[in-house]
Amino acid sequence: MILIYTHKITPRLRFVVRHLFRRIMGANAELTDSVDDFVKHAGPKLTYARQPLQSEFFIRSNELLFDRNIEPQDIHWRDWEGVPCFFELDARSSIPFDVFAASFFLLSRYEEYLPHQKDDLGRFRAIESVLSDRQGAMKRPLVDLWALKLKEALVEAFPGIGFKDREYKVNVILTAISAHKYSYRSVSRHIFESFIDLGKLRFTALSARFKTVILGHKDPYDNYLELHQPLGEMGVQLFPFFQYSRYDVNDRNVSWSKSKYGFFLKHINDYLEIGYLRSRLALEDVGLFKLELKKMQQLLHRPLHKVVLSEHRTLLPDAYQELVQEEVKEDFSMGYADVIGFRAATCTPFPFYDLGLEVEQPLRVYPICVSHEALRPLDVETVEKQLITIANEVKAVKGTFCLQLSNKYIQKMGIHSITRFVKAVV
C-alpha cells in the first residue's frame, strides 16, 4: 500500500488519487493527514503538500485541490521527457509538475465551468480547451501517460513496489437516432419522402425504399446483429444505443407509438444489452427525458444504466446531474463530435466529479476518442490510418479505446469496412 501524506484531505484530491493509482496504475493508495502515521509507515510513501516532511518522495501541491472555487488557472506547458504537462514545480519536487492538480483539472472538465464560447448547439468547443494550445496534446491520453511516468518514478524510488497490470480494450458505441431508414413508417410518410427523393432524382433511394417496404428486404440501417458477430469474434464489445421518443422532424426517427418498433428493440435486446439514446428534444426538456427513459425501461422490463447524449451535448454539470438523479450508471458521451482526441485527456473510464457540489458522483464516464462525425468526410484508407494512430496511443497505456459510430455511418461504409477498421485497432 502506498501512503500519501497531505496537510488536508479533500474530495478533489481523493478523486484524482483513486483515478491515477487504482484505475490506471493498479495500486492501492491511501491518503493521510497524520504525520505520525506517515512516519511510522514502512512501505512506499510520498508527500503532497507545500513542504516536504523529511527527504521523502515529494510533490509540491498546487492550491487547486484544496480550493472550492472555480476560477481561471495559469496554464503554461512544458515538456517532461517527451510528454507535455503543466502546473510546473521547482527542483525540490521529485517530479517536475503537479500531476494531481493537472489531472484533476482535465478529468473534472474544470475549464468547461469557466466562461467560454460555445458552438451552435451550446457545446464546449475543442478549440477552447487548453489541450488545443499544445500541438498533438489532444490526441494523447495525457492523464494516463502522467500516471505511468509517476509509476516509473515510484518504482525507481521504491524498488519492489507492486502494481497490477491491466489489459487494452476496444469498445464500439453504436448510436441509432433513427433505427431504420424505411421500416415502420406510415404510408403517408413513405409517399411524402418518395416525392422528395423523386424531386431530387434520388432513384437509388426510391429503389431501396421499394425493396424494403414492398419486397420485404432488410432495412439498410438494420446492421446491429450483423456487426455483433464479427466484433464478438475479435473480443470487442458492442454497445448499441437507441432513441425511443416521439417523432421529431429533425431526427426523422421512428416514433415510440409504433408497436413494431418496440418489438424490434426487444428482439435486439435479446442478443445485446441496448442502452438509451437521449433525444435532442429530451436534452432541452428534463420532463421529456424522464418520460423517454421510463417508457423504454417499461418496454424492456429492466432498468437502463447506459446512456448516450445525442450529438455529444454534455453540458456540464446539468446533463450529468440529470443522469445521476435518474440513477443512470454509465455515460458514453464524453468526447468531441467533430474532432479526434481525448476531451478529458484520459482513455480510462472515470466517475463524474461534480464541481458544483464538490462530490464524486456514481456515474461512470467512458471517454470517446473517435466519433463518426470526425470520420465522415474521410476515405477508407485515411480513416484506418487515423484510427491506428490514436489506438496506438491507447495501447501504449493499456487503456480503453472507445469508437462511436452511427448506424447511418455503418450503412454508408459497409460492414466489411467497419470490421476492417476495428480489426486494425484491436
Locations of the language-model features?
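Metal-dependent polysaccharide deacetylase catalytic core of the NodB/CE4 family, i.e.
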Residues: 182, 204-205, 225-315, 407
